Amino acid sequence: MNARVEEAYGEVERITRREAKNFAYGIMVLPREKRRAIAAIYAFARRVDDIADGDLDPARKRKGLHELHAALDRPAGDDAMLVALADARTRFRIPADALHALVDGGLQDLDRSRYTDFDELRGYCTKVAGAVGICCVAVYGSHDVERAETLGIALQLINIIRDVAEDWQLGRVYIPQDELASFGVSEADIAAGNASPAWHALMTFQAERARAYLQDGLGLLRSLDGRSALCVSTFAGIYRATLERIEARGFDVFDGPPHLSTLTKLRIVGQGLW
């Protein structure tokens, strides 16, 4: 491996340590080559998020995301993230269509801020999170793409529950519109931070669905080697613990999401070791 690629991997690992509040704890248990490949996937996903959620005007966001699409189909150039990702794609046969789907998810965030029903939301989650699962499972060495996608969707559903207030500030509501109506919750309730009994019932429903997806997705563990399985179970354990904290607060996420301490996250890693 040449110095340029080594430096690129060093950069994506720094990005992951700095930015990934949960991801870094899972990948720390992987062998070096796999850990660096997953860090490259994370850095790419982070770039998509930073463009879609950043302060650029919509036209420049769209341009930036289309440039990422194009970058996936040509030599990496001098961009450290793309250099590391290109090497990881070669080593682990990370599917290009999953990476393109991730960019499509970022573009969808520019075009849509509401989802009529869960089928529509699931399509979005498949792009922004299921695609990440598909990329990662190539690195883990499993062919269970279906459960990898399901697990990615599960984690995104938990993110949606956790980030309701933050997403509202960005002008987005990911909870399906028909479910808001069914439980008698309005967008005005979200704006007001109204953790009412109706809100609690709605979010209990969201949590139960996320937990069902998580349980199904964890079937992936059966196809993984020990360290890859530990990585995935750590991700899942951290997200499960986050969901439990949110439930314990009565789904009042309007003052910000709960944060797990470093010690708690390390304990979750340790639980997988025994």
Indicate residue ranges for each PLM-predicted region.
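Catalytic cores of Mg2+-dependent Asp-rich isoprenoid enzymes
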Residues: M1-Q156, I161, A165-W274
